[in-house]
Amino acid sequence: MAIVGLGTDIVEIERIQAHVARAGNKLAKRVLTEAELAIYTAHSQPSRYLAKRFAAKEAAAKALGTGIGRGVSFQHIHIGNNEDGAPTIHFTEGALARLQQLKATVGHISIADEKSYAIVTVIIESQ
């Protein structure tokens, strides 16, 4: 396997909290898939959850080489967790098309957060 994409993003959690306080769920509805939005609304720390998902999708779009836009939307990238709690990444629509264009077969994701920041790295591999 070869690495065909690498993306990293960092988000200040307080910036997301301020946006949510100012605009309500507008950002969450733009960034999160329907399944992610359900988790967000029930989460004990929704702004922290949103910050991590925002950073994850930005990192994934960078790894795809497009950024958000140019055919790739926040809605085309889903961040979940496996049965052990480790983060997973799934691509649909424009993000999946770009993944296939890169002849990539798998995406790996690491999410970390501390008091003030969330940081994510995404690696995309081909066979």
From Swiss-Prot:
Q: Where in the cell is it found?
A: Cytoplasm
One biological process term in Gene Ontology: fatty acid biosynthetic process
**Is Lipid metabolism given among the entry's keywords?**
yes
Keywords on record: Cytoplasm, Fatty acid biosynthesis, Fatty acid metabolism, Lipid biosynthesis, Lipid metabolism, Magnesium, Metal-binding, Transferase
Any single GO molecular-function term of the entry would be: magnesium ion binding
Q: Where does Mg(2+) bind?
A: D9, E58
Record bears the keyword Thylakoid: no
Family as reported in the entry's similarity comment: Belongs to the P-Pant transferase superfamily. AcpS family.
Protein name listed in UniProt: Holo-[acyl-carrier-protein] synthase
Q: Which organism is it from?
A: Shewanella baltica (strain OS195)
Source organism lineage? Bacteria, Pseudomonadati, Pseudomonadota, Gammaproteobacteria, Alteromonadales
This protein's encoding gene: acpS
